[in-house]
Amino acid sequence: MMITQEFETTKTLKLSRMIGNTPMIKISDKIYAKAEMFNPTGSIKDRPASYILDNAVLTGQLKEGDTIIEATSGNMGISFAWLAAERGYKCKIVMPSNMSDERKQMLRLYGAELIEVGEGDFDGAINLRDKMAEENGWFNCNQFNNPLNIKSHEEGTAEEIIDFFEGKYLEYVVTGTGTGGTLMGCKKKLDKKYPLIKMIAVEPAESPVMSGGEPGLHGIQGTGDGSKFLVDMNKVHKVMTVTTEDAKDRVIRLAKETGIFVGISAGSNILAAERWVEENKPNGYVVTFLCDRGERYLSCL
C-alpha cells in the first residue's frame, strides 16, 4: 500500500523536530535536573547546533551541498554532523585528540571528516577551524563566539525551565560551562521571571580557568574549554570546581542507585548542586542539567 503525501506530511517528522521539550528529573527535594540526553543525538548541543544552522539558512549563508566546519570537544560536533547528514551538508570537525573514542566514532558514523589536533589544544582547534573555513569558503559554525548559541537557550531551554517551575521559587542554576551558552542564555531569560536568581558555574578542578587558574588536561569532556568567549563573569554568582574522578564517581553511583546513566559533565553538575545545597541550605529550588548520555564515555569510566 502506498503512503500518501498527506500521511507523510501530517504523521511523520524529521528527527530535528524533536529537539527540546526535555523532561525534568527530581534528584532531591531541592534539586531538579533537565534531562538533555533525551535530545535526538543524546545531548544538549542539539539545541544550539540546530539554531545556528537554521539561522544560516534563513540568512542565505548556507544551502544544501555546502560544507560546515566546527571545533569541538565532541557533543556540538556530533550535533552538527547529524544535522549535516539530515540536511545534505558536508561536515568537517576539528577536535583535540584526547576526546573519547565513542565521540570520534559517532562523528565518523554520521559522515563527518574528523581532523585531530593535540591533546587539550582547543586554541589550536579553533585557529585551524578558522583558517580552513576562510581558505575554503566553508560555513564556520563558530560555537565559542556565536551569540546564537546563547539565543538558543534563551528561547528554548530557559522557557522550558520557566514552564516547569511555574508558581515555585527557583533560586539557583548550577551548570558546567563549555562555551557558556547554556549559562548565559538561561541567565538572560530567567532574570526576567526570577530577578534574584543566581548562576553557579562549574568547571574542572584540573582546569580552573574561570577561577583564575591555568588551563589543564581533564576528563570532564565538554566543560572548561572556551567559556572565556561567551561568559560574562559579572553574571556568575559563584564558580565551583569538581575533580574528574569525583564526577566519574557520581556518574557511577547515579547509575547504580537510580538507573540513570549520564555523561561525566552531568555527574559534575549533580555533585556541584548537591554540595551547594548542603553548604548553603537554599530556600528555593536548584536546577541543573544532565547534558548527555553516558554511553559515549564507557571507555573513560
Where are these regions (language model features)?
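PLP-dependent amino-acid enzyme catalytic core
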Residues: 1-301
